[in-house]
Design a protein with these regions (language model features):
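Hydrophobic/aromatic positions within or immediately flanking transmembrane alpha-helices
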Residues: 139-142, 170-171, 257-261, 300-303, ...
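A generic transmembrane-helix signature of 12-TM secondary carrier transporters
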Residues: 181, 310, 435, 441-442, ...
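N-terminal chloroplast transit peptides
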Residues: 1-52
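Substrate-agnostic recognition of the 12-TM MFS/MFS-like secondary transporter fold
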Residues: 101-156, 205, 209-212, 219-284, ...
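Intracellular loop-helix junctions on the cytosolic face of multi-pass helical membrane proteins
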Residues: 25-30, 75-107, 163-168, 175, ...
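Cytoplasmic membrane-interface "Motif A"-like loop-to-helix N-cap segments
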Residues: 162-179, 294-298, 423-436
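A helix-boundary/kink motif common to multi-pass secondary transporters
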Residues: 164-169, 252, 286, 298, ...
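C-terminal transmembrane helical hairpin of 12-TM major facilitator-type secondary transporters
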Residues: 431-485
Length: 589
């Protein structure tokens, strides 16, 4: 862990230390040579159209020189003269204040995603391997349990925001999650036979049509369904809403472009660590004495790690509130005071009406819903094959541990290239990579599922079965898709909130992340239910699911292109508001 932290610190330091401190020029633009201490909060010339770069560069240089009460130089003179060397003490101070602000954020994301991976793997094992259950229960869970729960939480969250500070809301929500997960392992699961209505479920199964059996399974294993719902909400609420909402409030657009991809370094190392922890716990089950409940013992260890990780996150949030947000070198005190005073007093109905009339929020919601529907369509089909290959909870959990580890490794590698993509190609290209990745890898998986005979020679040559080959290709598809999501889609989505006003940030983020994500998954699940009702089985519905997947991704790509234009426009407006060149021109005249 210390080595990973050191790597992140060095990467952050590299972004802060001016190139002339090492005796070489990294920047081609003369204005950029003056370093972060001069250009903090100013827009990057690389994001300005070429036709206006020269004039704007001159104004930037004059503006900064006027502030330091030095002689005004022309652009040509600025290019000819060498900048004054920056003192090592200034470099150390710049590195220190940035590490103080960004390292705790990276650690928070590490432990939040550490918990998320454990919860994600555990919830699948619980509901898929439960009595009279299977992968077909997932579409019904997401439609009839997850979506109503998400809508209810959005109403609660909106009410809490109007009554409490954002810091208190963070602690309240985190405490609720951690209390349930701790109680599930210690109280609920050991008493599951008393809590589960098995007799009533058996009676319902005796006369209801087969289409309703997944709903009966949810009723039978209602505590597992509750765990599945809250574990699923951890990703949309704690990761997307609480963490990224807080990070967006205290981070500028320029900082986000530089450091949001780097946050993924620690975040995806969390996937590796948590995956190996799940695998380690799965191995301990075999050493338990006869008569012991191996899955109950595993739950105790897994949920203990979740509660401990959540406690660390709350401690880091307290450190940010008391030591970072009160430091004027880390956060502008005027902006922080304004942020704390901001209250969202609109009712939920007014907020929903406002967001429905916002093309920006609609396009952003389309991205989130599109990802949820696309990944759900592919994932459910893959998990049905995964249960057939690993029917035992121990082997299923061990496979998911390895799956999470590989997801972390692949995402970590993709994350290293994320900043290069943002820097060279911009937000628009980065936003298109995830849907294109899902489209190509999904086509490969569905091809194997639809045309197994065509791949029979390959299966025989590899010495495996068609089932295992489908499991492995589906795993590769999910790993690449999630890697693209974590390394590019999530940073793109969070950057899109930064130029928005306070109302759109808070209510818009709540609506998009907490409702949009489950709506996407529930929408995909609802489509699967309709196809299953029409064609009888999920396997017979696969060709139509492939066509629906293509249509969803086309809509996703169109929304990303539209949002890119709006994002660039709003970012330019935000930069002009923070850096009014017109006012300087008037003073110059």
């Amino acid at each position: 862990m210390m080595s990973i932290t050191l790597i992140v610190v060095l990467l952050i330091s590299y972004q802060l230390v001016p190139s002339n401190a090492f005796g070489f020029a990294r920047f081609a633009n003369p204005v950029q040579q003056y370093g972060p201490s001069t250009m903090a909060g100013r827009p990057s010339c690389s994001n300005i159209p070429l036709a206006t770069t020269t004039d704007l560069t001159k104004k930037q240089f004059q503006y900064n020189s006027a502030r330091s009460q030095t002689h005004l130089l022309s652009t040509a003179d600025a290019s000819a003269e060498s900048p004054e060397p920056i003192k090592p003490t200034a470099i150390k101070a710049s590195v220190r204040k940035t590490v103080k602000k960004l390292l705790p954020l990276g650690l928070m994301l590490f432990f939040i995603l550490f918990n998320y991976t454990i919860l994600r793997d555990t919830k699948d094992v619980l509901v898929i391997t439960a009595p009279n259950s299977g992968a077909e229960i997932i579409p019904f869970l997401k439609t009839y349990v997850n979506l109503p729960s998400a809508i209810g939480f959005t109403l609660l969250y909106s009410s809490l925001l109007n009554r409490m500070s954002s810091e208190k809301v963070f602690y309240t929500v985190m405490t609720g999650f951690l209390t349930f997960f701790g109680a599930f392992a210690g109280i609920i699961y050991p008493n599951r036979m008393l809590l589960h209505p098995n007799a009533a479920a058996d009676w319902l199964s005796s006369f209801l049509p087969a289409f309703f059996l997944p709903l009966v399974a949810i009723f039978r294993n209602w505590t597992y369904a509750l765990f599945y719902t809250l574990a699923n909400m951890w990703g949309s609420v704690v990761v997307s809403l609480l963490f990224w909402g807080f990070a967006n409030d205290i981070t500028t657009v320029d900082e986000a472009k530089k450091y949001y991809p780097l946050f993924g370094l620690m975040a995806n190392v969390a996937l590796i660590f948590s995956g190996q922890y799940v695998k380690y716990v799965s191995g301990l089950r075999t050493s338990l004495p006869a008569g012991a409940d191996p899955w109950g013992a595993s739950l105790n260890l897994l949920m203990a790690a979740v509660v401990a990780g959540g406690g660390v996150v709350m401690g880091l949030m307290r450190f940010m509130q008391t030591c970072v947000l009160t430091d004027p070198q880390c956060v502008d005190p005027n902006k922080e005071a304004k942020r704390k005073k901001q209250k969202t007093s609109m009712s939920m109905a007014d907020s929903t009406k406002f967001l429905a009339n916002s093309p920006y929020i609609r396009d952003l919601a389309t991205l989130v819903i599109g990802y949820g529907m696309a990944i759900n369509i592919v994932e459910v089909t893959w998990k049905s094959k995964l249960k057939a290959a690993f029917p035992d909870p121990n082997s299923y959990s061990m496979f998911m541990g390895n799956f999470s580890t590989m997801t972390g490794i692949v995402t970590l590698l993709m994350m290293l290239g994320g900043r290069i993509i943002f820097k060279r190609f911009g937000w628009g290209v980065a936003a298109l990579i995830t849907p294109i990745t899902i489209l190509t890898t999904g086509a490969a998986f569905f091809s194997l599922t639809l045309f197994p005979g065509f791949f029979a020679p390959i299966t025989a040559r590899l010495g495996t079965t068609p089932l295992m080959l489908a499991v492995m290709i589906g795993a590769a598809q999910n790993i690449l898709s999630k890697g693209a999501k974590y390394s590019l889609f999530d940073p793109c989505k969070e950057m899109a909130y930064i130029p928005l006003d306070a109302e759109s940030k808070t209510k818009g983020k709540a609506a998009v992340d907490v409702i949009g994500n489950p709506l996407g998954k529930s929408g995909g699940s609802f489509l699967q239910q309709i196809l299953i009702a029409v064609f009888g089985t999920l396997e017979k519905s696969t060709p139509y699911l492939g066509g629906i997947l293509g249509a969803i991704i086309i809509a996703w790509i169109n929304a990303a292109k539209s949002l890119n234009k709006q994002f660039l426009q709003k970012s330019e407006e935000m930069e002009k508001a923070e850096w009014p060149l017109e006012d300087f021109d008037k003073k110059e005249q």
